[in-house]
Regions:
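Conserved phosphate-binding catalytic cores of ATP/NTP-utilizing and phosphoryl-transfer enzymes
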Residues: 6-23, 131-153, 331
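Glycine-rich phosphate-binding/hydrolytic loop that grips phosphoryl groups
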Residues: 316-354
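Active-site neighborhood for divalent-cation/phosphate handling
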Residues: 103, 107-109, 117, 123-146
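N-terminal beta-alpha supersecondary unit
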Residues: 20-94, 100-104, 133, 137, ...
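Glycine-rich phosphate-binding loop plus the immediately following alpha-helix
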Residues: 146, 169-211, 236-237, 241-245
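A contiguous, well-structured pocket-lining segment that forms one wall/lid of small-molecule binding clefts
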Residues: 49, 207-286, 295-309, 336, ...
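Conserved phosphate-binding/catalytic loops in two-lobed NTP-binding clefts
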Residues: 130-131, 303-328
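Short beta-strand scaffold segments in enzyme catalytic cores
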Residues: 35-41, 154-156, 162-166
Length: 357
């Protein structure tokens, strides 16, 4: 009798895990400039969260250098595994499956994590679970709020993505709205550069804005054809042009007020559209995810206005908004429970679309 292939053996293991309804997931995230390994139980319980950040290195270049990012992922990933196992007080024998981000992101960075995860899964005879990075961000809410269950509406806002999504069930999504051009995080980074704020611009702009008057400068509100869509390109351009015009006139720009006024414009647009989508879909619960979800004004406005609209509002702690592997472990568990596994030919997909699997 011909022996079963790796894929066939893993399907049998995954079936047993699904019947049991429990799984300890080793998760890997390497889509950009953070290498991360986490251990998550049942999609809800964080056992370990090991992260190696590259921010200080890329800050020297004013942004992420893909080749450097890939090399640093290779150097960091094995030590992070040891750290994660130590944090969880467990061994590889206790791991039931491996989840890995396979897109979207930087191709070289993704390949590091995918190749490592495939090798580990094959060597340890463990099921391999492919996870969309953006779905991971949404799933961070499951770890932060063990009582949160679908359906709910989620605003996903990061450096490369801005979406409003209806989460109808675990792993089942409907795209309600999205940016028609730039992502919110990209707009924050570009305006930060104009204000001579060093990398990473978005978080530093947020801190600067806390000290400013958000009514000091007037910026246009972008219009979109889609009822729930965003547009940040025009706003970003208007803000940058206004800064250049003021400087050409010899006028001083108050960086704190400028940052605060810009932040207010972006946050108002994000919150307005998200609450409109929640109202029109009849949602009772609202969540937020992604790096921009760490923005202090966005968090406070979503909570204040969401609760005023009668919604239950959930958001991850800031440490789970930026890239991490805990969120990948959470998403991976529900993919496993749905019977979704990767074959060993799994490849990195840097342009993977929203929740495309």
């Amino acid at each position: 009798m011909k022996p079963l292939s790796y894929e066939a053996r893993m399907r049998e293991k995954a079936d047993a895990l699904r019947k049991r309804g429990h799984a300890r997931i080793l998760a890997v995230e390497s889509s950009c400039d953070e290498t991360a390994i986490a251990i998550v139980d049942d999609g809800r319980i964080e056992r370990a969260n090991a992260i190696a950040s590259q921010i200080d290195v890329h800050a020297l270049y004013g942004g992420v250098v893909p080749e450097i990012a890939s090399r640093m992922h290779v150097e960091a990933i094995d030590p992070l595994l040891e750290l994660a196992l130590s944090q969880a007080n467990c061994s590889l024998e206790d791991i039931d499956a491996i989840a890995v981000t396979y897109g979207p992101g930087l191709v070289g960075a993704l390949l590091t994590g995918v190749s490592w995860a495939k090798s580990m899964a094959y060597a340890r005879e463990l099921p391999l679970i492919p996870v969309n990075h953006i779905e991971g961000h949404v799933s961070a809410n499951y770890v932060a709020h063990p009582d949160l269950e679908p359906p709910f509406v989620c605003l996903v806002a990061s450096g490369g993505h801005s979406h409003i999504v209806s989460v109808d069930h675990y792993g089942q999504y409907r795209l309600i709205g999205q940016t028609t051009d730039d992502a919110a995080g990209e707009a924050f980074d570009k305006v930060a550069r104009v204000l001579s704020i060093p990398y990473p611009g978005g978080p530093l702009l947020d801190k600067l804005a806390d000290e400013g008057d958000d009514r000091a400068y007037k910026f246009p509100r972008p219009h979109t054809e889609g009822r729930y869509d965003f547009s940040f390109s025009g706003l970003k351009t208007a803000v940058i042009n206004q800064a250049h015009n003021l400087r050409q006139q010899g006028l001083e720009i108050d960086a704190k007020d400028f940052a605060a006024s810009f932040r207010r414009s972006v946050v108002d647009l994000l919150v307005d559209k998200t609450l409109l989508a929640a109202r029109d879909t009849g949602a009772k619960k609202l969540t937020v995810a992604g790096g921009v979800a760490a923005n202090s004004l966005l968090r406070s406005e979503l909570m204040r206005r969401g609760e005023k609209a009668g919604l239950q509002v959930f958001m991850p702690p800031k440490r789970l908004c930026t890239d991490n592997a805990v969120m990948i472990g959470a998403a991976g568990f529900y993919r496993l429970m749905a019977g979704e596994l990767a074959e060993l030919r799994l490849n990195a997909l840097p342009s993977l679309r929203m929740f495309e699997n």
